[in-house]
């Protein structure tokens, strides 16, 4: 009720009633501008603090640390707006200093020497000239910046996003989502930074303060804001007894080479010279079939089970039987067998095994023809005569078309080794042509003096997997083939008797192989691989040889240079005075592919590094493989999938798949480099958190126990074991290693370009997984910024550009200058090796004929004259 007694349904407060100003007349734009000006004037006058507002400011009680101001709520107090001409605060306790000339209270920042800004946080000690309290950063040597307790960087000038610091340059240093404070110099006091990453963050920010960052670069933390695993897996149960090897030789009671139908001469040679007492299961099944029957065969067996001898022994045995029947066999008696392999390395290895077997019969001659070798030398060997030929499809097709001395009329065996790989590499058309040409030129009649040889040409197809392309290859080459595989295990026999059907598997790994996987975020990939290798070679004899599989050649070059570099003096390095480093091969061929692994070595166990990829010259690849196989010292080979197929590398204990394979079959062949012939072996694959964890199900499909046969690791566990230390000291060591590697790459244009090439090639290779696995290895899920850190890069992904992907061709003058510098002994310019794409382009150019432009023009004129009539020549008519 109002004062005059009138009854109202609303209440009028004490606020004075102000008439609402109306704007009329003129254009609507002018009215709108006048309205905004009036509103701004009213807002400015109402925001001016009064004495009542100042003294009613929320207060903090230092004794109880409880909010006692007006209208207490759970929200944090907001920042108080202060005018430019206002320099004192009221209502604060004794620990809050008032603004005075040149003195700032705790939690305040002097920005530009004029405006004062406070964050109204817990009382802190005021800045003293020349001394900074914990959590402070002196920027530019003049301005002092106080960091909030929440860990946000102060706004020194302009507008900086949270987690950024302006170091006096034009650009801000971003910590990639890091919001914790840093200590620029000195040591961190205990408990000065929230969380458990104080040591690691200190190392990052010391790197910035010491000038290790250039404008536009990003120095990020390793152990923060990494994606976590989204799936939980049961720990594998401990096996009561170790698994029985599935590819081991049989016991002498079960089978001997003599019982398989081999002659005493060959069986004695295998047992005495080659130290082979008994065959494997697949050798037992194959030799018995191929010695006594002339039908085609498909040999399927897991990797490392001895498929090479499974088809070589029957061929050699039947040729030996021919010579024992009174027929004189020599090198010009004819070509009896052709063996096709997909790669040059496998071709060389088959030839090496054949050479060992033929030592018992030196009159039988075998040789090889493959790409990368001199055609003239191969023609000379073929002209002398050969009985068994090991070849790659492309080079054999070339010789069949252009080499007249290659007579395939007497060929009785055609072996297609690694049939799935032959089809994947695109040799289908070459194999079709080879089969047709051999069929047309072969002798149909059976000679009486060759009774022990097959009456018809026998085709043998070998593969560890049964895929659609292998079946298509079988349709091309096989006729009424016999499927040969090892005898089933006792467990499989029992399941079959009980009516349990065998599970369809994408691949079958040896049972004695210990398979594990590691969930590693992209940022931690490099330090995790380093820690894993350090741990593997920590003690002498723990691991003899290891293979690291990487997806592309440029990445192989980068990691080889990284692990073989000379570390900084502050790092843990091998003391050459305390330990004798193993001698490296003196051959000029391998000086760029073999080096000391200083990063992963220690004083008690030095390691030798090897690298191998398809862009290397053939003679270099052969020499590197030979050095790795024959080395008696601990060694690591960093390679692409060129070393994953068929190569029998002795004493390989550990296989690391740093980059996931492009298909499940590639994984089978990779891990098949270890756990061979019944020996134990370990394999570990790197997977990133998220969708890549679905690949664990594919890994488990290769084992009878499924996921129980797999062991799970985390990046933190592997890094802690590799770098060691007390407590969480391993984090600081890993961070120091990462920063050191980044400095190493930034200090040299050569290594920086190698890192960028490796990064870009890795991304291109990541997009080439098979279609049915592309949802697991999805490019959209890849964090390019975190992945760049794994290549020691500080650039943003969008600014990583590789100069010289297609460099200009070297002129004659440039070559002359380089030759003169080399003659004077001057050091050549430090450049990165050519990228993988450039090397492939040069290989294509090598196959093109070199044609002079003037000569081509002259030929064209002569050709035109031949087709011109006399009338047209003299412009008649």
Swiss-Prot record:
<keyword id="KW-0378">Hydrolase</keyword>
<keyword id="KW-0539">Nucleus</keyword>
<protein>
    <recommendedName>
        <fullName>ATP-dependent RNA helicase dbp7</fullName>
        <ecNumber>3.6.4.13</ecNumber>
    </recommendedName>
</protein>
<dbReference type="Pfam" id="PF00270">
    <property type="entry name" value="DEAD"/>
</dbReference>
<keyword id="KW-0547">Nucleotide-binding</keyword>
<feature type="domain" description="Helicase ATP-binding">
    <location>
        <begin position="288"/>
        <end position="484"/>
    </location>
</feature>
<dbReference type="GO" id="GO:0000464">
    <property type="term" value="P:endonucleolytic cleavage in ITS1 upstream of 5.8S rRNA from tricistronic rRNA transcript (SSU-rRNA, 5.8S rRNA, LSU-rRNA)"/>
</dbReference>
<dbReference type="InterPro" id="IPR001650">
    <property type="entry name" value="Helicase_C-like"/>
</dbReference>
<feature type="domain" description="Helicase C-terminal">
    <location>
        <begin position="512"/>
        <end position="719"/>
    </location>
</feature>
<dbReference type="GO" id="GO:0003724">
    <property type="term" value="F:RNA helicase activity"/>
</dbReference>
<comment type="similarity">
    <text>Belongs to the DEAD box helicase family. DDX31/DBP7 subfamily.</text>
</comment>
<dbReference type="GO" id="GO:0005730">
    <property type="term" value="C:nucleolus"/>
</dbReference>
<keyword id="KW-0698">rRNA processing</keyword>
<keyword id="KW-0347">Helicase</keyword>
<feature type="compositionally biased region" description="Basic and acidic residues">
    <location>
        <begin position="825"/>
        <end position="845"/>
    </location>
</feature>
<comment type="function">
    <text>ATP-binding RNA helicase involved in the biogenesis of 60S ribosomal subunits and is required for the normal formation of 25S and 5.8S rRNAs.</text>
</comment>
<dbReference type="Pfam" id="PF00271">
    <property type="entry name" value="Helicase_C"/>
</dbReference>
<dbReference type="GO" id="GO:0016887">
    <property type="term" value="F:ATP hydrolysis activity"/>
</dbReference>
<keyword id="KW-0690">Ribosome biogenesis</keyword>
<keyword id="KW-0694">RNA-binding</keyword>
<keyword id="KW-0067">ATP-binding</keyword>
<dbReference type="InterPro" id="IPR025313">
    <property type="entry name" value="SPB4-like_CTE"/>
</dbReference>
<feature type="region of interest" description="Disordered">
    <location>
        <begin position="34"/>
        <end position="101"/>
    </location>
</feature>
<feature type="compositionally biased region" description="Polar residues">
    <location>
        <begin position="85"/>
        <end position="98"/>
    </location>
</feature>
<feature type="short sequence motif" description="DEAD box">
    <location>
        <begin position="417"/>
        <end position="420"/>
    </location>
</feature>
<dbReference type="GO" id="GO:0005524">
    <property type="term" value="F:ATP binding"/>
</dbReference>
<feature type="binding site">
    <location>
        <begin position="301"/>
        <end position="308"/>
    </location>
    <ligand>
        <name>ATP</name>
    </ligand>
</feature>
<feature type="region of interest" description="Disordered">
    <location>
        <begin position="814"/>
        <end position="845"/>
    </location>
</feature>
<dbReference type="InterPro" id="IPR027417">
    <property type="entry name" value="P-loop_NTPase"/>
</dbReference>
<feature type="compositionally biased region" description="Basic and acidic residues">
    <location>
        <begin position="50"/>
        <end position="73"/>
    </location>
</feature>
<dbReference type="GO" id="GO:0003723">
    <property type="term" value="F:RNA binding"/>
</dbReference>
<dbReference type="InterPro" id="IPR011545">
    <property type="entry name" value="DEAD/DEAH_box_helicase_dom"/>
</dbReference>
<feature type="short sequence motif" description="Q motif">
    <location>
        <begin position="255"/>
        <end position="284"/>
    </location>
</feature>
<dbReference type="Pfam" id="PF13959">
    <property type="entry name" value="CTE_SPB4"/>
</dbReference>
<dbReference type="InterPro" id="IPR014001">
    <property type="entry name" value="Helicase_ATP-bd"/>
</dbReference>
């Amino acid at each position: 009720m109002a004062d005059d007694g009138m009854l109202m349904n609303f209440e009028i407060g004490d606020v004075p009633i102000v008439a609402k100003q109306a704007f009329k007349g003129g254009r609507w734009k002018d009215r709108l501008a006048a309205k905004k000006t009036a509103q701004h004037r009213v807002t400015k006058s109402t925001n001016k603090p009064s004495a009542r507002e100042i003294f009613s400011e929320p207060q903090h009680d230092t004794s109880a640390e409880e909010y006692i101001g007006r209208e207490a709520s759970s929200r944090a107090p907001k920042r108080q707006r202060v005018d430019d001409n206002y320099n004192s605060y009221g209502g604060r306790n004794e620990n809050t200093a008032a603004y005075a000339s040149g003195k700032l209270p705790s939690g305040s920042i002097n920005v530009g020497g004029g405006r004062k800004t406070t964050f109204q946080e817990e009382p802190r000690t005021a800045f003293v000239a020349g001394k900074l309290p914990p959590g402070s950063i002196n920027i530019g040597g003049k301005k002092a910046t106080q960091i909030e307790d929440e860990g946000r960087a102060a706004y020194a000038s302009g507008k900086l996003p949270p987690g950024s610091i302006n170091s006096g340059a034009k650009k801000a240093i971003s910590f990639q989502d890091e919001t914790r404070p840093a200590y620029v110099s000195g040591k961190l006091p205990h408990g000065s930074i929230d969380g458990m990453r104080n040591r690691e963050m200190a190392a990052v920010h010391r790197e910035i303060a010491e000038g290790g960052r250039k404008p536009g670069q990003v120095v990020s933390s390793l152990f923060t804001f990494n994606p976590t695993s989204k799936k939980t897996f049961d720990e594998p149960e401990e096996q009561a007894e170790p698994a029985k090897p599935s590819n081991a030789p049989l016991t002498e009671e079960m089978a001997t080479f003599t019982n398989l139908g081999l002659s005493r001469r060959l069986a004695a040679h295998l047992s005495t010279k080659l130290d082979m007492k008994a065959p494997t299961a697949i050798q037992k099944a194959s030799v018995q079939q191929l010695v006594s029957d002339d039908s085609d065969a498909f040999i399927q067996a897991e990797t490392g089970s001895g498929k090479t001898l499974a088809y070589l022994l029957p061929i050699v045995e039947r040729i030996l039987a021919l010579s024992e029947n009174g027929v004189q066999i020599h090198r010009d008696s004819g070509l009896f067998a052709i063996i096709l392999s997909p790669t040059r390395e496998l071709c060389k290895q088959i030839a090496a095994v054949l050479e060992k077997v033929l030592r018992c019969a030196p009159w039988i001659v075998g040789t090889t023809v493959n790409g990368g070798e001199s055609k003239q030398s191969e023609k000379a060997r073929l002209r002398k005569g050969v009985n068994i030929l090991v070849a790659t499809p492309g080079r054999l097709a070339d010789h069949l078309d252009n080499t007249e001395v290659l007579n395939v009329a007497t060929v009785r065996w055609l072996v297609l080794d690694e049939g799935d790989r032959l089809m994947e590499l695109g040799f289908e058309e070459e194999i079709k042509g080879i089969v047709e040409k051999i069929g047309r030129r072969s002798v149909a009649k059976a000679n009486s003096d060759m009774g022990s040889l097959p009456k018809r040409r026998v085709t043998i197809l070998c593969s560890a997997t049964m895929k659609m392309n292998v079946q298509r290859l079988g349709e091309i080459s096989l006729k009424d083939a016999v499927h040969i595989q090892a005898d089933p295990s006792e467990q499989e026999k029992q399941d079959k008797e009980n009516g349990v059907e065998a599970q369809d598997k994408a691949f079958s790994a040896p049972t004695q192989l210990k398979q594990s996987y590691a969930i590693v975020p992209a940022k931690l990939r490099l330090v995790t691989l380093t820690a894993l290798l350090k741990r593997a070679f920590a003690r002498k004899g723990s691991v003899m040889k290891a293979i690291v599989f990487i997806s592309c050649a440029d990445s192989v070059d980068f990691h080889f240079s990284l692990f073989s570099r000379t570390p900084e003096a502050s790092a843990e390095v091998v003391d050459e005075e305390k330990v004798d480093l193993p001698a490296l091969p003196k051959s000029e061929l391998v000086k760029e592919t073999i080096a000391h692994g200083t990063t992963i070595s220690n004083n008690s166990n030095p390691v030798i590094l090897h690298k191998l990829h398809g862009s290397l010259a053939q003679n270099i690849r052969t020499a590197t493989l030979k050095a790795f196989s024959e080395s008696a010292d601990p060694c690591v080979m960093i390679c692409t999938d060129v070393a994953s197929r068929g190569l029998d590398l002795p004493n390989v204990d550990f296989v690391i798949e740093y980059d996931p394979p492009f298909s499940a079959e590639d994984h089978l062949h990779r891990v098949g480099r270890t756990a061979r012939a019944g020996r134990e072996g370990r394999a570990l694959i790197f997977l990133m958190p998220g969708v890549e964890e679905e690949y664990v199900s594919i890994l488990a499909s290769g084992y009878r126990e499924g996921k129980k046969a797999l062991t799970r690791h985390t990046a933190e566990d592997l890094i802690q074991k590799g770098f060691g230390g007390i407590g969480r000291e391993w984090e600081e060591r890993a961070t120091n290693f990462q920063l050191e590697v980044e400095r190493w790459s930034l200090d040299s244009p050569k290594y920086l370009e190698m890192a960028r090439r490796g990064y870009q090639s890795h991304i291109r290779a990541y997009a080439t997984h098979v279609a049915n696995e592309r949802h697991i290895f999805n490019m959209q899920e890849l964090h390019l910024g975190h992945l760049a850190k794994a290549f020691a890069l500080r650039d943003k992904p969008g600014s990583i550009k590789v100069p010289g992907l297609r460099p200009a061709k070297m002129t004659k003058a440039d070559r002359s200058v380089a030759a003169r510098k080399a003659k004077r002994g001057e050091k050549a310019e430090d450049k990165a090796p050519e990228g993988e794409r450039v090397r492939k382009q040069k290989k294509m150019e090598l196959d093109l004929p070199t044609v002079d432009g003037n000569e081509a023009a002259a030929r064209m004129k002569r050709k035109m004259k031949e087709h011109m009539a006399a009338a047209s020549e003299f412009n008649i008519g």
